[in-house]
């Protein structure tokens, strides 16, 4: 029986999926799998028997990915499970940035006890006037699970939509509205659009991509939205751009001491994925991926090892090997198995950067000698006997 430990409260829509082969444990030291949302694992001592970590959400900055990979711990996330929630809040952000709705609501609260509140509203509402989004040019950097559907919704709202994503998948491209105009570089987006939103992962090359240089290339009075990652935007440069009027409004889902006190910034309390539907979807996806890996050895939506799926084992035995991506490894694995007079019924080998994963279905249950032989091969991190 597999032991599962939660580091955060997980939706019952997900926890109800565990079968009788899984049991919850309060002791992380005994856990085969950990499921979490936002808990920080960087300072945790990872137990030696831990096999997998599933993040009920997309971001994995709270998980030590390389450390996990080196220990043979597969880390999963749930891309797309919260995409609709984030996309809808981004649409809301466009409206909040284009019309001073928040300022108007706050003003009404300040005069709510005045008996002439209705007259005051009619007299003072003009100070909160804004602009329609229909007809405006929307630039979307990143056309994945959030950016793609956002582009399609914005088109239906009458916006001119421009998208930039050099890594767009074939599926995402096929699903994109035919009227979305493709831009080759973010710089083309900067020069063209009235509203700009970023939907890219936080990587070394994307950190502070919205900086002083990028802002200087944008239209005066541009509205910028960030519902992806806090550090995609240089806060110091943004504060200067808001003060000068270069940026009319900055809407972010990531408040910090700088943005929470930044004039012209609307800081939303990280509500992008905070819907019941999103939390349910993420939990279901995380649990299913965890169960499939622990029971069958299949890897789907890992962020530190390659995806590799051979379905449910139909043979008498299955071995999986987490290893470093060293040339010739597969040959050494098959030779080790053949030396024990074991026939391979099927195999799959995938690599991802420095790491690789091999699944081997065998004609009979592997012996302890076969397993030990595999463990001794250079670069092997972990060997599991699934069946």
Can you name each region flagged by the protein language model?
Residues 1-79, 211, 216, 223, ...:
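An N-terminal-biased, well-structured beta-alpha scaffold segment characteristic
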Residues 39-44, 166-259, 274:
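Rossmann-like adenosine-cofactor binding region
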Residues 79-137, 171, 301-303:
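Phosphate-binding beta-alpha-beta segment of Rossmann-like dinucleotide-binding domains, i.e.
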Residues 87-106, 154-159, 285-298, 334-338:
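Oxidoreductase and adenylate-handling cofactor-binding alpha/beta cores
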Residues 146:
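Hydrophobic/small residue at the entry helix of a nucleotide-binding pocket
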Residues 220-313, 357, 361, 372, ...:
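Rossmann-like dinucleotide-binding domain for NAD(H)/NADP(H)
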Residues 304-387:
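A conserved regulatory-domain signal marking ACT and ACT-like small-molecule sensing domains
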């Amino acid at each position: 029986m597999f032991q599962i430990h939660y580091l955060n409260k997980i939706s019952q829509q997900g926890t109800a999926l565990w079968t009788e082969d899984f049991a919850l444990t309060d002791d992380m030291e005994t856990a085969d799998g950990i499921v979490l949302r936002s808990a920080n694992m960087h300072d945790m001592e990872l137990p030696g028997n831990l096999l997998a970590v599933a993040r009920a959400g997309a971001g994995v900055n709270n998980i030590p990915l390389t450390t996990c990979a080196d220990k043979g711990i597969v880390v999963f996330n749930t891309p797309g499970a919260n995409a609709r929630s984030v996309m809808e809040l981004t649409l809301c952000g466009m409206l909040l940035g284009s019309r001073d709705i928040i300022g108007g609501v706050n003003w009404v609260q300040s005069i709510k006890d005045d008996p002439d509140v209705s007259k005051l509203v009619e007299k003072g509402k003009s100070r909160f006037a804004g602009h329609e989004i229909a007809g405006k040019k929307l630039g979307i950097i990143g056309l994945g699970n959030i950016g793609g559907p956002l582009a399609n919704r914005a088109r239906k709202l009458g916006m001119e939509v421009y998208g930039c994503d050099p890594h767009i998948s074939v599926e995402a491209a096929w699903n994109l509205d035919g009227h979305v105009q493709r831009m080759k570089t973010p710089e083309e987006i900067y020069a063209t659009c009235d509203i700009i939103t970023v939907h890219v992962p936080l990587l070394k090359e994307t950190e502070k991509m919205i900086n002083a240089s990028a802002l200087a290339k944008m239209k005066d009075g541009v509205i910028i939205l960030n519902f992806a990652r806090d550090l995609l935007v240089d806060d110091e440069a943004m504060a200067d751009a808001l003060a000068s009027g270069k940026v009319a409004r900055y809407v972010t889902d990531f408040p910090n001491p700088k943005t929470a006190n930044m004039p012209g910034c609307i800081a939303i309390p990280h509500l992008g994925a905070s819907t019941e539907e999103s939390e349910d979807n993420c939990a279901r996806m995380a649990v299913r991926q965890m169960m499939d890996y622990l029971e069958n050895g299949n890897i789907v939506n890992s962020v530190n090892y390659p995806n590799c799926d051979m379905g449910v084992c139909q043979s008498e035995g299955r071995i999986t090997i987490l290893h470093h991506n060293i040339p010739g490894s597969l040959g050494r694995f098959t030779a080790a198995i053949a030396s024990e007079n074991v026939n391979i019924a099927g195999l799959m080998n995938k690599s991802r950067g420095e790491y690789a994963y091999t699944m081997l279905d065998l004609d009979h249950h592997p012996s302890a000698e076969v397993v030990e032989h595999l463990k001794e091969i250079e670069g092997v991190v972990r060997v599991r006997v699934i069946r």
